[in-house]
């Protein structure tokens, strides 16, 4: 089955919805989720999803968020204040971003993704996701123009989700 990552995240979710809105996919890899009413992204929501992934056998190590949600995560009150002692001869550095999140179930790298929807935060275990080759890399001759030989590099790849329960998502975020 070929589908987007969101069509494979069903078990470990936090969503804001009813039986009509905010619904997880019904058939993995085929259907996708239905959006619910947006709500604020909180540390409680993130902790809930991480705990669900861990309880389902995953060891999450990455949190993929939009740039907007990256700023929200950096502002979670549970993150310790970071300070550097500034040498008298140097410039001061203001730290206001977070790149790692230490949870009760391990450390997650916070990865900003400019192509991801702002309403989704994905908690992933990279051990259970991979690239699958539908057609391996190949080089084809395409055209000769004068002395130049032109070639094409061609491949077909897709995402392979090896265990849906090793991943999770916080959805319907504002």
Regions found by a protein language model. Give the residues of each.
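Hydrophobic beta-strand segments of well-ordered beta-sheets in folded domains
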Residues: 60-65
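Sequence/fold signature of self-assembling virion shell proteins
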Residues: 1-48, 58-59, 70-174
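A short acidic-Thr-Gly-centered motif at the start of a beta-strand
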Residues: 53-56
């Amino acid at each position: 089955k070929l589908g987007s990552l969101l069509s494979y995240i069903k078990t470990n979710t936090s969503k804001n919805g009813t039986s009509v809105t905010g619904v997880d996919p019904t058939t993995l890899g085929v259907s996708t989720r239905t959006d619910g009413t947006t709500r604020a992204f909180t540390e409680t929501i993130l902790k809930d999803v991480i705990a669900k992934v861990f309880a389902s056998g995953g060891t999450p190590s990455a949190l993929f968020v939009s740039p907007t949600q990256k700023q929200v995560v950096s502002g979670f009150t549970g993150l310790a204040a970071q300070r550097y002692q500034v040498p008298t001869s140097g410039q001061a550095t203001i730290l206001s971003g977070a790149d790692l999140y230490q949870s009760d179930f391990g450390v997650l790298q916070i990865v900003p993704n400019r192509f991801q929807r702002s309403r989704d935060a994905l908690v992933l275990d990279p051990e259970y996701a991979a690239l699958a080759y539908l057609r391996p890399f190949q080089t084809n001759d395409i055209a000769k123009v004068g002395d130049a030989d032109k070639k094409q590099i061609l491949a077909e790849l897709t995402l392979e989700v090896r265990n849906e329960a090793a991943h999770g998502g916080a959805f319907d975020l504002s």
